[in-house]
Amino acid sequence: MQSDDVIWDTLGNKQFCSFKIRTKTQSFCRNEYSLTGLCNRSSCPLANSQYATIKEEKGQCYLYMKVIERAAFPRRLWERVRLSKNYEKALEQIDENLIYWPRFIRHKCKQRFTKITQYLIRIRKLTLKRQRKLVPLSKKVERREKRREEKALIAAQLDNAIEKELLERLKQDTYGDIYNFPIHAFDKALEQQEAESDSSDTEEKDDDDDDEEDVGKREFVEDGEVDESDISDFEDMDKLDASSDEDQDGKSSSEEEEEKALSAKHKGKMPLRGPLQRKRAYVEIEYEQETEPVAKAKTT
């Protein structure tokens, strides 16, 4: 039979308790079912056969109750009741389940439930709040990011310098008043361009008309207008033709002599000694030029 006074005298005063922690001023209890965390007679979960406490598991609160009737069954020693997430309903559940428990235990259970609810709300707020997260980076990635930042900074400085320089040039009229170009001067330039294009078109039309007028007209040209260089070219061409004819005649005569020698050899006659004499063909070319005085007709 269980006796709470005997257990407390044994654990609390004389012998050793594995859940007890002593300090200079006070003793604490490390048992997971401890209601207040203090080591005293009313808060000890081992020395009280009728006991209750509140525990939190994965964001959900549970009410644990112990009675003396289940002391002989350690497997069924604690009864667990799930509490509502609504604070008022949870307090009502505590009152309903702890009707026959001491008032001290009922009050401490409500106090413990209130503290657990407060830190759960605090946890939810912190999770929803934006927080800094430290991410470890390798040295290689860190160097790469640093180089990229330096290049981006240089590019930004260069763009700013270019923009500043362009603004200064614009203020100093370096580009010759590009944006404030006078309209009358622009119109004058357009008129000059149109006049030049019209004059060029008229000249082309006049040339075309002259060409059309010259069609069908006859002109007589004097014989003396032929250049001497053209005549010399014609003479050179005639000489080339004559030399080619001579070569062809010489080749034909040599072929005939060779054929005669071969035929004589077949007939049993001795071939002629010595080199064969080739005959050269002489060609005489005469040029006749007739000059007649012709009056040149000039048209106006």
Curated annotation (Swiss-Prot):
Keywords: Acetylation, Isopeptide bond, Nucleus, Phosphoprotein, Ubl conjugation
Compositional bias annotation for Acidic residues: 193-214, 222-236
Regions of compositional bias (Basic residues) in chain numbering: 263-278
One GO CC term on file: intracellular membrane-bounded organelle
Stretches for region Disordered: 191-278
InterPro entries membership: Mak16, Ribosomal_eL28/Mak16
Cross-linked sites for Glycyl lysine isopeptide (Lys-Gly) (interchain with G-Cter in SUMO2): 55, 151
Annotated compartments: Nucleus, Nucleolus
GO molecular function: RNA binding
Positions of modified residues (Phosphoserine): 197, 200, 229, 232
GO biological process: maturation of 5.8S rRNA; maturation of LSU-rRNA
N-acetylmethionine, modified sites: 1
Family indicated by similarity: Belongs to the MAK16 family.
PANTHER family for this protein: MAINTENANCE OF KILLER 16 MAK16 PROTEIN-RELATED, PROTEIN MAK16 HOMOLOG
Protein's name in the database: Protein MAK16 homolog
